[in-house]
Every structure is written in structure tokens, then in C-alpha cells.
């Protein structure tokens, strides 16, 4: 019985961490996304969209700077009364902690689901 568990464990781990299939899927998705973007550019700017590339780059850089400014605005600013800053920083830290806890809980749930599936497969193979 332990041999079956070992084989299943190594088989499932290999499938779960197989990088070639993940890379192929990501590459395929990236190619589809690139084709969609190219079609959008041709549709929006016409067949000579390459001439508009410098303007597009400037607009994208401006959007990136705005996003960076918005990201920095999310952080609490230090100023005013020290006791108000302490509460604000504490709330900000708890927000970050709860966000990380959510990620960990998701990973635990995925691990538990895969464990249950592996036990079900082993039960089906063992009987």
C-alpha cells in the first residue's frame, strides 16, 4: 500500500510542478494576447500603426507614472499628531497582514483539496 502512495505522491508532485506544461500554456496565452493587441492597434490606428509608437510609449509612460503616484498615495502619510499616525500605521499594517493571511489561506485550501483528491484516487486504485 505504501508503494502506491509513494508512486501517487511522486506522480502528483511531478504533474503539479511540471514547468514545461506551465511554460507552454503561458507562451500560448502570451501569443494570443500579443495577437489581440496587434489587432486592436491595427483596428484603432489603421495599418500604419507603427508610426504612432512614440506617442503610444509617451502615453503609456504617463499612465505608469500616474499609477505609481496612486500606489504611493495608498500609503499613509506621516504628519500631524503622533497618536493619529500610530493608529493609521497600525491599520495599514493590519491590512497588509490580513492580505497575506488571505494568500496563505488560499494555498492551504488548494493543498487540502489536492490531498483529498489524492486520497480519493488512491482509494479507487486500492480497491
From Swiss-Prot:
Expressed by the venom gland (anterior main gland) (at protein level). Residues 1-18 form the signal peptide. It comes from the Eukaryota. It is found in: Secreted. GO terms for cellular component: extracellular region. Its main location: secreted. Keywords: Secreted, Signal. This is Venom protein family 16 protein 1. It comes from Platymeris rhadamanthus.
Amino acid at each position: 500500500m505504501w508503494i502506491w502512495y509513494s508512486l501517487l505522491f511522486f506522480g502528483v508532485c511531478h504533474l503539479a510542478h511540471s514547468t514545461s506544461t506551465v511554460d507552454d500554456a503561458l507562451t500560448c496565452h502570451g501569443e494570443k494576447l500579443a495577437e489581440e493587441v496587434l489587432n486592436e492597434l491595427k483596428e484603432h490606428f489603421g495599418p500604419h500603426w507603427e508610426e504612432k509608437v512614440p506617442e503610444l510609449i509617451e502615453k503609456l509612460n504617463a499612465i505608469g507614472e500616474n499609477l505609481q503616484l496612486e500606489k504611493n498615495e495608498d500609503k499613509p502619510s506621516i504628519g500631524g499628531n503622533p497618536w493619529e499616525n500610530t493608529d493609521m500605521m497600525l491599520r495599514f499594517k493590519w491590512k497588509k497582514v490580513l492580505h497575506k493571511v488571505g494568500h496563505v489561506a488560499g494555498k492551504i485550501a488548494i493543498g487540502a483539496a489536492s490531498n483529498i483528491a489524492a486520497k480519493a484516487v488512491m482509494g479507487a486504485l486500492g480497491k
